Amino acid sequence: MKKGKMIIISGPSGVGKGSVNGELLQNPDLHLRYSVSMTTRKPRNGEVDGVNYFFVSNEEFAKAIVNDELIEYAHFVGNSYGTPRKYVEQELKKGNNVILEIEVDGATQVLNKEPNVLSIFLMPPNPTELANRIRGRQTEDEEKIKARLDKALLEIPLKHNYQYVIENDNVPNAVAKITDVLHLEGLTDIKTPTVYERLEQIVEQIVKEKYMYFVNNWETNVKLLAKNEEEKNKAKNFDAETYLIKLLTKKVYHKVLGHGDFSKLLDKDFVDFKIQKLMFKINFFSVEQKHYNNDEF
């Protein structure tokens, strides 16, 4: 049986991790299990012990740390949060993927210690929307809300430590993006092609229609700029068309993951517009020619 994978879905407090994960867990093709965190904070209205969190005392939490029962833990706004190790390891052995809905501090610990991890950073559309979501909970006073917002400003720059950055402008859009990422990473039973694969086909059409003159000149220049025998041999195998298709696909895909309507990736006019902008921005002379075989993709 194939072992499951830990999936970190992290981001600032109030970004909507719980709402997104709740929807993801409804899809049986994703083989997802939710890792119930341990916390010392008081339950919010409607939260159930053992379902939403394991609510424990400060003493019990400290004991769990000493006994190495937590994969990660962090202290946040006067409370402690951690991920119990036993449940996660059991589910991974069963072939399930386990969502770790954790704060950025805890995610950093896991990324530094665990090799079998897929990491996703969930972004708010803007700071105002983040503040509105936190206030909308109506569970904390203004001082704690300010502390959460201040911490968010320190956490958001750490998004580049994650494999994928996904904006949660609305839950259905964010769920569609994450579902495709999981499919792309080979973690689902979904049989249809990924949006990424379909996007790559659209990009290929556009490159063939509009950019072959550029491609041919690029290949010629690479060969002319080769300085020694090793570089000349590599230049012979340089497939500029394939390289450009993969480069543009990757950039357009990640751009829309970070901001935009995911369904637009299947709109040829939209993709064409994005490619036009990228072609002016990419400095092709700075692209490392060591990747002649497209191995970075």
Curated annotation (Swiss-Prot):
Transmembrane segments: none annotated. Essential for recycling GMP and indirectly, cGMP. Belongs to the guanylate kinase family. This is Guanylate kinase. It catalyses: GMP + ATP = GDP + ADP. Residues 204-297 are annotated as: Unknown. It is found in: Cytoplasm. Its EC number is 2.7.4.8. The keyword Signal does not apply. Residues 4-183 form the Guanylate kinase-like domain. Its main location: cytoplasm. InterPro entries: GK/Ca_channel_bsu, Guanylate_kin-like_dom, Guanylate_kinase, Guanylate_kinase_CS, P-loop_NTPase. It comes from Mycoplasma mycoides subsp. mycoides SC (strain CCUG 32753 / NCTC 10114 / PG1). Keywords: ATP-binding, Cytoplasm, Kinase, Nucleotide-binding, Transferase. One of its GO terms (molecular function) is ATP binding. ATP binds at residues 11-18. It comes from the Bacteria. GO terms for cellular component: cytosol.
